[in-house]
Amino acid sequence: MTELSPKYNPAEVEAGRYQKWLDADVFKPSGDQKAKPYSIVIPPPNVTGKLHLGHAWDTTLQDIIIRQKRMQGFDTLWLPGMDHAGIATQAKVEERLREQGISRYDLGRDKFLDKVWEWKDEYATTIKEQWGKMGLSVDYSRERFTLDEGLSKAVRKVFVDLYKKGWIYRGEFIINWDPAARTALSDIEVVHKDVEGAFYHMNYMLEDGSRALQVATTRPETMFGDVAVAVNPEDPRYKDLIGKHVLLPIVNKLIPIVGDEHADPEFGTGVVKITPAHDPNDFEVGQRHNLPQVNVMNDDGTMNELAGDFAGMDRFEARQATVAKLEELGALVNIEKRVHSVGHSERSGAVVEPRLSTQWFVKMDELAKQAMDNQETDDRVDFYPPRFNDTFLQWMENVHDWVISRQLWWGHQIPAWYNAEGEIYVGEEAPEGDGWTQDEDVLDTWFSSALWPFSTMGWPDTDSEDFKRYFPTSTLVTGYDIIFFWVSRMIFQSLEFTERQPFQNVLIHGLIRDEEGRKMSKSLGNGIDPMDVIEKYGADSLRWFLSNGSAPGQDVRFSYEKMDASWNFINKIWNISRYILMNNEGLTLEEAESNVAKVAASEAGNVTDQWILHNLNETIAKVTENFDKFEFGVAGHILYNFIWEEFANWYVELTKEVLYSDNEAEKVITRSVLLYTLDKILRLLHPIMPFVTEEIYAQYAQGSIVTAAYPTVTPAFENEAAHKGVESLKDFIRAVRNARAEVNVAPSKPITILVKTADSELEDFFNSNINYIKRFTNPEKLEISSAIAAPELAMTSIITGAEIYLPLADLLNVEEELARLDKELAKWQKELDMVGKKLGNERFVANAKPEVVQKEKDKQADYQAKYDATQERIVEMHKLVK
């Protein structure tokens, strides 16, 4: 047995430990076919950069689950991997190239992809280093990447099979277009923001010049693509105009007036300009009336030749130029400033442009119905917390067809080929013969991610060992912000292609926020690098904070104050472990277990030993129960209270009565209970704080705590009598301590303690444990009896079954104490007067910085609280001498 360092140093504790675990292969599945399998696939992080605090939280929760299940004897697999993250990664690489004055088009597709693979290798290495520093117990022998050949094969099969069923189709529709990334986006890749904008009101003159129809738009630059104006066929103001024409300003082209219910008589003038190539509602109107589709923009957001003199202008530049021209022509009625919601690309931040485009889509109605129906069966996915099942169902009910093609080079190239005759071939392999050209677009990243739980297990080879043993997976851990992006798609793809749920449980966590409750973001500059936190506090402290503040579905606020508390808790564990091991005298864990069995059988030990084992039993039961419900925060609070309050503050202190005695037999038993309880504590804590628990465990045990058995309840430890007795003993000691503190009597001063109880069992218990009472209360005189008479002047504390009297004559001189309190009251009044004068100065309040004023207000509140407490103490003292 070696000795723990005098001071807890997380850098020393954690250095090299992860590599030792990897070298020992302790993270791989046990291979025990008799054991029940338990599997998790890691939500693959994007290879776009370093991991953030949200990733740290997400992976910590997974590691807690898998470490506990491993210790419980499950055949565990935690499969790691990363996502190619098409648009995000390509944007990063293009940004790096732009700094060198190079575009992807300068390189060409193949050389550009070489650059992206270099990026992927660089950041994949960084991510794995971060996983190591976090202590994640993943099985690297099964590491996957969404562009691996095995996963690519699965992607091609799914695409081809859905195409053959008619559930993947190619069509021309209005989609969300990112002009910066030059690619289509799905609805959920669009972030809507309220921005300052305007409604531009314009007059379109009837062809005979008799009157004008007023239309309004937020995007006047699209008017070059107007092909009609629409009015409601039931609107009496305009129904006679249906079939006539108006003159499109600037372009001087006649366009028809159509009757369509899309035009709302109650909104604006009731007249709507129709631009089928640039608005989804207008597209549908165009379909109903067989209108042409005129696209007036290039894919980079500039105007094309159909915009006439405005060709080549950026769309926003063209907006201002168009408005100026309309004003010059007298066609601009007015500009109405208004805040409105505008879609932005989640990745590039560019304003999204609704644009007519030929894309590939997944038909969603049958897939969504299948997913919703499955939630009514025994094979349903259980959400934690359950309310997210409703969220999932609502999204599925309102789902649109999914645009899956992206105008990128990085990703799974669509397995479709075209020839000069206009034929399309879709297959897992390229068609035979010459003259075929593969579609240049790639699939949406989420298309391959949706297959992650089963493609990583070897599917479409359903005979693969991993697929047969570990699929469906057991639990998915993810944030509520990607339930629709990812969770729902995994569910419907898994049901379609494996006829099974992808996972049994989904644990939903919230977001990491800063101390003020704001979402962490680059724009706010409030992001926290988890590696910086680990460098200062250690991985275990970060993991304890992340788990201890965790409740399913809830957000967590990060603060350094909480990190300090986490470090302090681990330091406490370190110190009590060091104390126990230094007093261990060579006792082995096996010997301790044998001696503890004697305590449970009441053959050895004392009531405090029985009490701590009883409470340990309860702690094991409650922690295990809450782990099973993914209530890690609740489990953490239970552990914290048991370790710090019951074990360290009480039991360890109580054992000093034995350890400092001459009774060698009792010492052995006490050391045994200390070591045994410490061992169980470390095992309970290990899933949350793996490094420090391994370091301490290695001081007294063989092997790794990673594969040590997780604690279970021992029925023989149940002892309500011991529990009740020691709790009464604690109440007694607390009552005396509180009374001393109330009248400022030092613990070192001996006092008289009189205890009156009519409970003979309690009297016997106190008398039989008189040494503990004396050690913790320091009495000069101690009497415990049913015949005690209450002194005339005494502090009285009532506990269950007894009254405790502390005669005032032993405690203090009341007159002197009142004089001292009067002085203290005057001091706080003086402080209140000073700060009150400052805050009463209007010039100070008006001119000082807000934080300075707030500091004075905080002082005032603090002084007032101290004044009130002192005054209350004076009142209590007067009561005592009446």
From Swiss-Prot:
Q: Which InterPro entries match?
A: aa-tRNA-synth_I_CS (IPR001412), aa-tRNA-synth_Ia (IPR002300), Anticodon_Ia_Val (IPR033705), M/V/L/I-tRNA-synth_anticd-bd (IPR013155), Rossmann-like_a/b/a_fold (IPR014729), tRNA-bd_arm (IPR010978), tRNAsynth_Ia_anticodon-bd (IPR009080), Val-tRNA_synth_C_sf (IPR037118)
As recorded in UniProt, coiled-coil segments are 808-877
User: What EC number is given for this enzyme?
Assistant: 6.1.1.9
Domain of life from the UniProt record = Bacteria
Q: What is its main location?
A: cytoplasm
Q: Where is this motif: 'KMSKS' region?
A: 519-523
- Subunit organization: Monomer.
Record-given protein name? Valine--tRNA ligase
Q: Which gene encodes it?
A: valS
